[in-house]
């Protein structure tokens, strides 16, 4: 992986994530209602838009992170934030923990949030780490010029979370 040292003292592969994924029942209901009304509005005013995928990726993120945490073959450093944590923790501490978490492990899980993209993907690359991109049909820049598979692990989101985790482990050990 392009000069990134993935060796560690542990026999397990270190993987990190820091971000929002822990939703309360109220958060899930709010997200469902927003998506429901968004889809109705788009069907009425923009019938040409294909919205086959969920508008929010938070449910996917939550399920995937649980699967990563439960896997005994990985040394996971996962900090799951609640939506309102940013108002409870100082901005400096919040950012420090986020950046430190990416630097802690050679691999960082990058799965979409509310949009079909991951800013964490670019931040991980900028910090010299390897992103594990869970691909939900997102478009990467310059994909006709850059072989992204040389710089990151890209796993299609077309199966169960446990199988995605297994695919990540196979890709790392290949």
What positions do the PLM features span?
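Catalytic binding pocket for nucleotide-activated donors in carbohydrate/polymer assembly enzymes
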Residues: 97-174
């Amino acid at each position: 992986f392009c000069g990134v040292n993935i060796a560690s003292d542990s026999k397990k592969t270190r993987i990190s994530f820091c971000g929002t994924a822990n939703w309360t029942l109220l958060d899930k209901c709010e997200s469902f209602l927003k998506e429901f009304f968004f889809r109705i509005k788009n069907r009425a005013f923009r019938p040409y838009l294909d919205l086959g995928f969920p508008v929010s990726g938070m449910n996917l993120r939550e399920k995937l992170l649980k699967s990563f945490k439960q896997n005994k073959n990985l040394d996971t450093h996962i900090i799951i934030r609640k939506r309102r944590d940013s108002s409870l923790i100082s901005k400096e501490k919040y950012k420090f923990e986020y950046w430190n978490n990416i630097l802690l492990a050679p691999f960082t899980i990058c799965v979409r949030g509310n949009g079909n993209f991951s800013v964490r993907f670019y931040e991980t690359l900028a910090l010299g780490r390897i992103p594990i991109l869970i691909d939900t049909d997102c478009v990467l820049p310059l994909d006709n010029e850059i072989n992204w598979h040389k710089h990151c692990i890209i796993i299609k989101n077309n199966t169960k979370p446990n199988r995605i985790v297994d695919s990540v482990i196979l890709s790392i050990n290949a």
